[in-house]
């Protein structure tokens, strides 16, 4: 059974290169894939200012970050296919890609996969959880034709 994904993409910034809605759809479907048969997801691509404001408000960190995940948490008695929202900062992704010698496309794919896994409940706070999440991310990213995102370039 293939995933039916309703994706809302919001481009709230500009850049020399941003992923297309088709690329975002492919990467999100790959990450969510077998976890659900229907899902709704919003991906908002923002500038550093908006990322910093959200990161400060929700995580207490007064700086922009690559990706923020906001899972939708419905009351237990309500079953909705709403997965949640991802907010991705284009400038941070660009800087990280450059620093890590990765292509923009590869790093964007990694950030979408990483964020979707957070929405599915994965985390990387504890070492054991981090290993599980990174292993799954690596499998998913490699299935998309990119190299291991955690391998030093």
From Swiss-Prot:
Task: Tell me which cofactor or cofactors this protein depends on.
Answer: Zn(2+)
Listed binding positions for Zn(2+) are 114, 118, 124
Q: Which PROSITE patterns match?
A: UPF0054 (PS01306)
Q: Which SUPFAM superfamilies match?
A: Metalloproteases ('zincins'), catalytic domain
In alphabetical order, the GO MF annotations are: metalloendopeptidase activity; RNA endonuclease activity; zinc ion binding
- Does the record carry Nucleotide-binding as a key word? no
> Which GO annotations describe the biological process of this protein?
rRNA processing
Q: Give a Pfam family name.
A: YbeY
> Looking at its record, which EC class is this enzyme?
hydrolase
The enzyme's E.C. designation: 3.1.-.-
Q: Can you quote a single GO CC term?
A: cytoplasm
Q: What does this protein do?
A: Single strand-specific metallo-endoribonuclease involved in late-stage 70S ribosome quality control and in maturation of the 3' terminus of the 16S rRNA.
Q: Which PANTHER family match?
A: ENDORIBONUCLEASE YBEY, CHLOROPLASTIC (PTHR46986:SF1)
Question: What is the protein's name according to its record?
Answer: Endoribonuclease YbeY
Q: Which organism is it from?
A: Shewanella sp. (strain W3-18-1)
């Amino acid at each position: 059974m293939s995933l039916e994904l309703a994706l809302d993409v919001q481009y709230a910034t500009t850049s020399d290169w941003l992923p297309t809605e088709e690329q975002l759809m492919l990467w999100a479907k790959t990450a969510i894939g077998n976890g659900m048969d229907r899902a709704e997801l919003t991906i908002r691509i923002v500038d550093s200012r908006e990322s910093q404001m959200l990161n400060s408000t929700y995580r207490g960190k007064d700086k922009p970050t690559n990706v923020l995940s906001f899972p939708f948490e419905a009351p237990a008695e309500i079953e909705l296919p709403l997965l949640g929202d991802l907010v991705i900062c284009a400038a941070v992704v660009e800087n990280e890609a450059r620093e890590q010698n990765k292509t923009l496309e590869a790093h964007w794919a990694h950030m979408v996969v990483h964020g979707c896994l957070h929405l599915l409940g994965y985390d990387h706070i504890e070492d054991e959880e981090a290993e599980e999440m990174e292993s799954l991310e690596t499998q998913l990213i490699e299935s998309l034709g990119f190299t291991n995102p955690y391998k030093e370039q």
